[in-house]
Amino acid sequence: GGPSTGLPTKSEQTDLLQVLYGRNGESPMPVIAATSPTNCFDAAFMAAKIALEHLTPVVLLTDAFIANGSSAWKLPNINDLPEIYPHRVTEEQKYRYTPYQRDPKTKVRYWAVPGQEGYTHILGGLEKDGETGAISTEPENHKGFFEVENWVREYCSQNNIPLYGSYDPTCI
């Protein structure tokens, strides 16, 4: 048995392939897997930190074994947790903000809180030019999106996030 077969599920990693490769087109994203009931809080916190600091979707994987498990766990002191630094828009961007602009140094998009005057924008599902926000089908623009994905490996290695497995994105 397995997921969606009508049979009881067993411990397996079939969902991992779905998470890594089940998206439209070429759109890599960070995937974090909790390793134990005790690890769930840290994994969820780190997933939120990555999502908010890099404005990217992050998938957090758990399973029934972890969900039904239990272990002693001490609630962490919130002041001991690493700070989350969202990459917010600047006052200089007011009335000139587009959600496709990236910080030239970090390659992270700026985050405008919805409803702020001077930062209104419209999002769509088509690929946009990284500077203007106009619809783009140019190969160079598309290539630029893949160059940005390198931050995942750099971020994980700089922030002591354990990486299990190969650095090769084609290897599971």
What name fits each language-model region?
Residues 13-14, 25-29, 53-57, 171:
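Short coil/turn connectors at secondary-structure junctions
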Residues 1, 33, 59-63:
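Short beta-strand segments
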Residues 2-9, 30-37, 109, 113, ...:
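Hydrophobic alpha-helical scaffolding
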Residues 43, 48-172:
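Flexible, low-complexity linker and terminal segments
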Residues 2-4, 39-40, 67-70:
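Short, well-ordered, mixed-charge alpha-helical segments that flank or form enzyme active sites
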Residues 1-26:
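Flexible glycine/proline-rich, aromatic-decorated loop/lid segments
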Residues 26-51:
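Active-site/ligand-binding-proximal alpha/beta "capping" segment
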Residues 23, 35-36, 64-65:
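A broadly conserved detector of short glycine/acidic/proline-rich loop/turn motifs that flank catalytic sites
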